[in-house]
Amino acid sequence: MRVLVSACLLGRNCKYSGGNNRNEKVLAFLQGKEVVPVCPEVEAGLPVPRPPVEIRKGRVVRKDGRDMDDIYRLGAARVLSRMGKVDLAILKSGSPTCGVHDIYDGTFSGKKIKGRGVLAEALVRAGVPVVDEKELLSGRDAEGVTAFRDKP
């Protein structure tokens, strides 16, 4: 089984802040599976660290208002072009690229709204089952993830 995973969840320091979101339970789930680590921001050539972005009115923007949409969508497109066939994607919740169910609202106030990040949306459109780390670990089956729990 091939699983595409947000690289920050694996402990790679690729977050906008320069840190990571290493998640031991995600790592345990991935044991025995082929892992395809991705960071769309890094794929797009953005530095680590980098200014934070949010999605405002469907566009990826920095706090200073600079539109970053094209570069973030380029990163998502590069992930799709190189990923090959994957059976499942586990992405970082809340991220403007990887958020599956919620994203920050574009005001940089910490408020979340329902929505998907640009990579999550592209994967869903490509027919890839997508979950975030919270959904994977909660036992909920909103995207049929339990069917993947025991697959090698």
Regions from the PLM with identified roles:
Residues 1-4:
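Extreme N-terminal starter segment of soluble prokaryotic enzymes
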Residues 11-18:
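Short N-terminal binding/cap micro-motifs at the start of the first secondary-structure element
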Residues 22-36, 74-89:
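Short amphipathic alpha-helices and their capping/turn segments at secondary-structure boundaries
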Residues 43, 52-81, 111-152:
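Divalent-metal-activated hydrolytic enzyme cores
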